[in-house]
Amino acid sequence: MKKNRPGIAKMPFFIVAVLCLSIFSCNNESTQTQTETVQKPAAFVKKAPAFNEDSAYYWVQKQVAFGPRVPGSKAHANCASFIEKTLKDYGLTVVVQTAPITTYDNKIFNLKNIIASYKPEFQKRVLLLAHWDSRHIADNDTKDENKAIDGADDGGSGVAVLLEIARQLSKADLKVGVDLFFSDLEDYGQPDDSDKPKMQDSWCLGTQYWAKNMHVPGYTANYGILLDMVGAKGAIFPREGTGSYFAPDVVNKVWSTAKNLGYSSYFTDDNTGNTTDDHLYVNTIAKIPCIDIVHMSPVTGSYGEHHHTHKDTMDIIDKNTLKVVGQTVLEVLWQE
């Protein structure tokens, strides 16, 4: 049985009217108060310093000037020394991993992974990585297929952005640790038309080794960002499938940062299929959620036309693209 509220029906009309008005007034005031307490999302505020695209461009030039950084070559050795010295000059803690690695063609190379750490004592960490070796063949070209490529974009651009970030870190006081991982033997994978026995997981050998043999025992990071082919004119960076599968929150973090910086024409919301790149093994072996900022066509899923060809030279490198990627990653770090 419904319980009646006593006395309301017997009150004079004007009292009831006043009471109703009072109740309405109170309810309306409560509604206004509730409306006023709804907070709008905080406006985005830039925190990172300006990324120097001229400096990054110079770092690409420096690498290409050594020649193709094919494992076992003099250019490879010289470039390794250059990267290591530059990182140490910026005051970072540097570890060089070396190990004999067998490739699909049954050759043995002395692997050189280079890891530089900013504030290594901090538990909260972000991993940034790029491969520094270049492809030993031009298997996507129609001429000189068996000759090594310059690798200005594929290899050179990612390293250049990381070196410029290292320079900025040397002057910073962040509340997060950062590890810059320069992986070796990423691009010595088995070509599709190889006459050699099929080798499983022939790509990204440096990262596979690192993930199984951490440079610091028990190392981990909150998340990782891989930079691969991030310097070409007209580059587009869709949401790559492997990263979206393993680390969707990291993809959203980076792409929303790029959007807030006005870079939506570069960092698009298109989705691509999965790729086999260093971040695959960071996710599956090291168990660190990691994404890939990589130049891909959102329509065909293929990389840039210069990929693994002799067109991958300084002629295709664009300072604006280096700026967009570098500034986005810097902002992600500074927002931490």
Regions found by a protein language model. Name each.
Residues 22-25:
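C-terminal motif of bacterial Sec signal peptides marking the signal peptidase cleavage site
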Residues 44-50, 65-74, 101-104, 145-155, ...:
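Second-shell loop/turn segments in exported
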Residues 38-79, 90, 301-316:
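N-terminal capping segment at the start of a domain
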Residues 68-121:
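A non-catalytic alpha/beta surface segment that caps or lines the substrate-entry region
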Residues 2-13:
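Bacterial N-terminal signal peptides that target proteins for export
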Residues 98, 223, 230-336:
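Active-site-adjacent substrate-binding region
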Residues 28-38:
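Bacterial Sec signal peptide processing site at the extreme N-terminus
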Residues 147-249:
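Acidic/histidine-rich catalytic neighborhood of metal-dependent amide-processing enzymes
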